[in-house]
Amino acid sequence: MEHNKAGSSGQCPVMHGGLTSASMSNMDWWPKALNLDILHQHDSKTNPLGADFNYREELKKLDVEALKRDLKALMTNSQEWWPADWGHYGGLMIRMAWHSAGTYRIADGRGGGGTGNQRFAPLNSWPDNANLDKARRLLWPIKQKYGNKISWADLMILAGNMAYESMGLKTFGFAFGREDIWHPEKDIYWGSEKEWLAKSGGENSRYSGQRDLENPLATVMMGLIYVNPEGVDGNPDPLKTAQDMRVTFARMAMNDEETVALTAGGHTVGKAHGNGKASNLGPDPEGAELHEQGLGWNNHTSRGIGRNTVTSGIEGAWTTHPTRWDNEYFYLLLSYEWQLTKSPAGAWQWEPVNIKEEDKPVDVEDPSIRYNPMMTDADMALKIDPEYRKISERFYKDPAYFSEVFARAWFKLTHRDMGPKARYFGPDVPAEDLIWQDPVPAGRKDYDVNAVKAKIAASGLSISEMVSTAWDSARTFRGSDKRGGANGARIRLAPQKDWEGNEPARLGKVLAVLEKIAAESGISIADTIVLAGNVGIEQAAKAAGVNVTVPFAPGRGDATIEQTDVESFEVLEPLADGFRNWQKKHYVVTPEEMLLDKAQLLRLTAPEMTVLIGGMRVLGTNYGGSQHGVFTDRVGALTNDFFVNLTDMSYTWKPTGRNSYEIVERKSGKVKWTATRVDLVFGSNSILRAYAEVYAQDDNKEKFVKDFVAAWTKVMNADRFDLV
């Protein structure tokens, strides 16, 4: 390699391009290849705290009251390098917490403030997150002081809570328990646009039809948290903005009342910044020069701080007293007429007509100067949209009710992605169970598990019926927002009992048998369903010549319909399940990509996904009894036949349709088996084939069974946060 000789004059001895994005990656060369990286995130190799670090144990050492005092003191400790507006950082800290939690979307449970992901790209450099890097730097001395006893994820949300409390709001509560990640998430789809703040209708737009927002997205533009504050595509029209708000907030699991409360409560304090030229700002943190040390949007042309700060481009406060919690927002919004104007930075905003001098907020640095308050197009939507207006009027007339609704909505916003209360920690956890937490009562643990297994084994249910039902119950789990799973046995309730993918007729038959056993044994149906799956696997392993006991942890409870938000659970309905070789219909996304997404939500690794596919196929668990991918003559025995036959070169593979293939004997031309894309990707993709070959080896038959059991148990216990 003459061009890279270490001794050559003036040349770097490091291979050029290998350590940066200058070289082409495999995904650049083969963009249609499966990106298995989404299954291999956030492991101990990237975590500087090590594999043995236990955040919950560290939390037990935390002096919560001291931390809260330090945060409240921070609010009014203005720093010269980034001065606090009116001497109070509350508005900035609330915006940081809002924008951390506000990326959550209900469709796939991804986003949100549960991982501290705002520290990393792309979120740390989203246009809507401009200058939140300053908020995190202001928090750094506190993080440094308390160290491992408080995660960045918890600290950012708690800072928002303390900001509100320091300005007079009685918050609903707070739970610790969010664990930090250490690199950007690779599984979250933020949109296909190639530029920030791309308008709808352009290339790779997230909108189609009559402004139909692409699923699972919950924000109107690449780089915004929810709606464009200047109006749809930057064109002011409060009624159209109201439509966007209704869609985006619904996709964050909020109703109209919560939407009005969160918008108003978020704008009751603080201000927007646009008193200058946006063109004077430097690159975002991810694109800034080395010497900027991770700070972005720096203004080296003009003063750029205090009253001269530019962030969103919109300029001004919403209320007369932006550092206290009160009802001035609704007073100003509803008492005055408002007219369109532009900020010094050129952004559209609304200002009041003939406002009283005493209703104007003072300058952030000089209290002798007063300016007009402002409203964004989203604020005006609360006044113009008929339904939002009714809610706003009620909040205006009843400030106490507004404060209560906001406090609850803020708690929901900042905790929705944490999952069940079993994950909550700390002295301020509310005692009340909330329906959006998907509450599940505790189940019995003190019973004879083997006696129940014996009843199940004698029930007449087939291996396929037992395993399929247990899988369907557990597969709803989402590691993103910790919802779903087998605990609660909601598979027997609406809407899950009627989902097409759950085969209602087969499900009803199996549940009738298992519910009777559960009642006789005095245990939960949830435990019985999982136990039945385990019994089926043990029988199948024995048929393959391997004796194994599938681990089981009793204690699941049974949720009631009163504890179940039916509409909220609709988003958990599987559109496809590669593990049971099923999809509801053909989609633009390939079946193997949907399998990968499901595996990631289940928190499976690629080897775990592989071994589960091979086992589920030979157990005969395909939807509707389909024979696709059942590469065995011993259905019901937990053998490695799927992998043996998939890698056997005495067969060829021929497409017969969009998602169907035939496995043909090379010599005779006889069709031996049929398959789908999900089956054949394990022989096509080079990485998955490497795993498949491991399980096809003669010396790994027992390893296959043990690995299948381990992966199965991981899925069955995915939602058992009470065991952690």
From Swiss-Prot:
Q: Which CDD domains match?
A: catalase_peroxidase_1, catalase_peroxidase_2
Q: Where is this cross-link: Tryptophyl-tyrosyl-methioninium (Tyr-Met) (with W-98)?
A: 226-252
Query: What GO cellular-component annotations does this UniProt entry give?
Result: cytosol
The free-text cofactor remark is:
Binds 1 heme b (iron(II)-protoporphyrin IX) group per dimer.
Where in the chain is the site Transition state stabilizer? 95
A single Gene Ontology molecular function, please? heme binding
The name this protein goes by in its record: Catalase-peroxidase
Q: Name one GO biological process term.
A: hydrogen peroxide catabolic process
Q: Keyword check for Oxidoreductase, yes or no.
A: yes
Q: Write out the PTM section of this UniProt entry.
A: Formation of the three residue Trp-Tyr-Met cross-link is important for the catalase, but not the peroxidase activity of the enzyme.
The residues the record assigns to binding heme b are 267
Q: Which reaction does it catalyse?
A: H2O2 + AH2 = A + 2 H2O; 2 H2O2 = O2 + 2 H2O
Describe its partners and assembly state: Homodimer or homotetramer.
Which Enzyme Commission number(s) are on file for it? 1.11.1.21
What single Pfam family name could you report for this chain, choosing any that match? peroxidase
Described by its record, this protein's role is as follows: Bifunctional enzyme with both catalase and broad-spectrum peroxidase activity.
Active-site positions on this chain: 99
Q: Is Nuclease among the key words of this record?
A: no
Instruction: Give the family from UniProt.
Output: Belongs to the peroxidase family. Peroxidase/catalase subfamily.
Under InterPro entries, the record lists:
Catalase_peroxidase, Haem_peroxidase, Haem_peroxidase_sf, Peroxidases_AS
Q: Which gene encodes it?
A: katG
Q: Which cofactor does it need?
A: heme b
Here the cross-link named Tryptophyl-tyrosyl-methioninium (Trp-Tyr) (with M-252) sits at 98-226
Keywords assigned: Heme, Hydrogen peroxide, Iron, Metal-binding, Oxidoreductase, Peroxidase
Q: Which domain of life is it from?
A: Bacteria
